[in-house]
């Protein structure tokens, strides 16, 4: 249909509508006009059928078959205008509805797009989360495996270290055992368990120190000065010993450092320092242990620890203890002579008289307590402990000495009481019933006598009663 020939029927298309259809559907202007004209014809036909006016004659008509009457022209024009307006409205409504539908489609499409975009983002985020979770899990697994490997490595390293420590400890035990066996064999061959020969051997060690160590050092001023410097380090440290294991280890390390410095300086200096240490132990025993016997244990432990690192110290310390206290062997000398009294451990006072027996007993018990503590703290010395105690009991008994030499009998009672207090429990623990027989013998009536003899005899009887009650021996334990 030609749009130029029907200006009243066709309205001018809105440029915005044309633009929107063109952009949305990809149609050009000619396509839109074709669509528009087709729809317009249909609507005009529908409207013309609906609003078709009834034919009325505006004025009376005389029938004549050859006459054709038309309605007035102004009515026809008005009707065409009215119909054109209605059609225009319908067209605009149709276009508006089409725009609404299109907008709704766009909105729905946008919503769908947004949903898909959100879902895509959600899926991507979930995928990333799972990826991160997997990486984290792998990292944790790797870290766990690493820690487990490290733990296993540390355990293996600790096991290796413990095995090495056990091996070294066993080697030390074996070496110590072999050394003790060799020493025991040497002692058996040398001493033949004869107290007098043991005493002579100890005195020979003292004589050797005097002639081969002390005398040469005295002639060398430089070495002598060095020895006196080391001397000032040893004495105060012995006074600092307590029952604390940590303090004992500290003092032992300081003393060993002093010994090592002396060893590095000169072999004679080393032996001189060891000899002075033994002298200091004796003085400490006379001053402190004589008053407080339980303090013998810490001092004895320091001596034992140092003996493990200084092979010459054991025999030298034994010789020094025996020189000042012959009861450690034990062996008696003829104390009726000045030389015999000196060898029995008596001290001569400045006025030329010998010390009183009470003072002598206290000093002898202090020195003997240190020796008994050494025997009790080291189980490998149990044979020596048994031999020492049995030798004491093989001496003339206190009941015999009560009539012949009461002071000597009192000293013997004090020494036996000291052994029972310090080393009795150790002997009983190692030798059991046999040790119990020996202990009971030491305070029996046959050995001690029923009564009399003074305070020393009485104390040994009280000690025996405590042992019979199962309460014998001093109660002592080291602290951390």
Swiss-Prot record:
Pfam families: GLE1 (PF07817). Its main location: cytoplasm. Keywords: Coiled coil, Cytoplasm, Membrane, mRNA transport, Nuclear pore complex, Nucleus, Protein transport, Translocation, Transport. Residues 128-193 have a biased composition (Basic and acidic residues). One of its GO terms (cellular component) is cytosol. Residues 91-190 form a coiled coil. Gene3D superfamilies: GLE1-like. GO terms for molecular function: inositol hexakisphosphate binding; phospholipid binding; translation initiation factor binding. It is found in: Cytoplasm; Nucleus, Nuclear pore complex; Nucleus membrane. The keyword RNA-binding does not apply. Residues 128-196 are annotated as: Disordered. The keyword Cytoplasm applies. GO terms for biological process: poly(A)+ mRNA export from nucleus; protein transport. It is a peripheral membrane protein. Belongs to the GLE1 family. PANTHER family: GLE-1-RELATED, MRNA EXPORT FACTOR GLE1. Functions as a component of the nuclear pore complex (NPC). NPC components, collectively referred to as nucleoporins (NUPs), can play the role of both NPC structural components and of docking or interaction partners for transiently associated nuclear transport factors. It is specifically involved in a terminal step of poly(A)+ mRNA transport through the NPC. Component of the nuclear pore complex (NPC). NPC constitutes the exclusive means of nucleocytoplasmic transport. NPCs allow the passive diffusion of ions and small molecules and the active, nuclear transport receptor-mediated bidirectional transport of macromolecules such as proteins, RNAs, ribonucleoparticles (RNPs), and ribosomal subunits across the nuclear envelope. This is mRNA export factor gle1. The lineage of its organism: Eukaryota, Fungi, Dikarya, Ascomycota, Taphrinomycotina.
């Amino acid at each position: 249909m030609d749009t130029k020939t029907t200006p009243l029927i066709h309205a001018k298309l809105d440029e915005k509508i044309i633009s929107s259809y063109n952009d949305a559907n990809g149609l050009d202007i000619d396509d839109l006009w074709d669509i528009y004209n087709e729809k317009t014809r249909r609507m005009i036909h529908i409207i013309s059928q609906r609003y078709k006016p009834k034919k009325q004659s505006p004025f009376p008509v005389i029938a004549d078959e050859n006459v054709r009457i038309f309605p007035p022209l102004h009515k026809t024009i008005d009707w065409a205008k009215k119909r054109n307006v209605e059609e225009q409205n319908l067209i605009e409504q149709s276009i508006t509805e089409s725009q609404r539908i299109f907008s709704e489609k766009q909105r729905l499409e946008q919503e769908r797009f947004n949903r898909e975009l959100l879902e895509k983002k959600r899926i991507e985020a979930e995928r990333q989360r799972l990826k991160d979770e997997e990486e984290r899990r792998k990292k944790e697994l790797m870290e766990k495996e690493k820690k487990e490997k490290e733990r296993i490595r540390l355990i293996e390293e600790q096991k290796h270290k413990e095995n090495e420590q056990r091996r070294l400890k066993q080697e030390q035990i074996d070496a110590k055992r072999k050394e003790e066996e060799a020493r025991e064999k040497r002692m058996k061959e040398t001493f033949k368990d004869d107290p007098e020969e043991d005493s002579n051997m100890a005195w020979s060690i003292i004589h050797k120190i005097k002639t081969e160590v002390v005398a040469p050092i005295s002639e060398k001023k430089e070495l002598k000065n060095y020895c006196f410097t080391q001397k000032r380090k040893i004495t105060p440290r012995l006074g600092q010993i307590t029952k604390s294991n940590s303090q004992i280890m500290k003092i032992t390390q300081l003393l060993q450092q002093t010994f090592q410095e002396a060893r590095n300086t000169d072999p004679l200096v080393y032996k001189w320092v060891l000899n002075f240490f033994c002298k200091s132990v004796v003085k400490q025993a006379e001053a402190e242990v004589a008053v407080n016997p339980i303090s013998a244990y810490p001092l004895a432990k320091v001596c034992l620890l140092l003996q493990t690192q200084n092979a010459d110290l054991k025999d030298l310390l034994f010789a020094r203890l025996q020189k000042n206290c012959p009861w450690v062997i034990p062996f008696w000398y003829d104390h009726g002579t000045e030389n015999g009294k000196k060898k029995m451990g008596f001290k001569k006072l400045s006025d030329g008289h010998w010390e009183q027996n009470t003072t002598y007993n206290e000093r002898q018990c202090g020195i003997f307590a240190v020796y008994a503590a050494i025997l009790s703290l080291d189980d490998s010395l149990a044979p020596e402990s048994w031999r020492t105690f049995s030798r004491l009991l093989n001496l003339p008994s206190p009941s015999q000495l009560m009539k012949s030499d009461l002071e000597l009998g009192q000293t013997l009672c004090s020494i036996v009481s000291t052994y029972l207090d310090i080393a009795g429990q150790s002997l009983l623990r190692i030798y059991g019933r046999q040790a119990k027989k020996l202990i009971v013998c030491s305070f029996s009536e046959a050995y001690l006598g029923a009564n009399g003899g003074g305070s020393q005899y009485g104390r040994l009887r009280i000690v025996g009663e405590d042992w019979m009650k199962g309460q014998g021996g001093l109660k002592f334990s080291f602290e951390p």
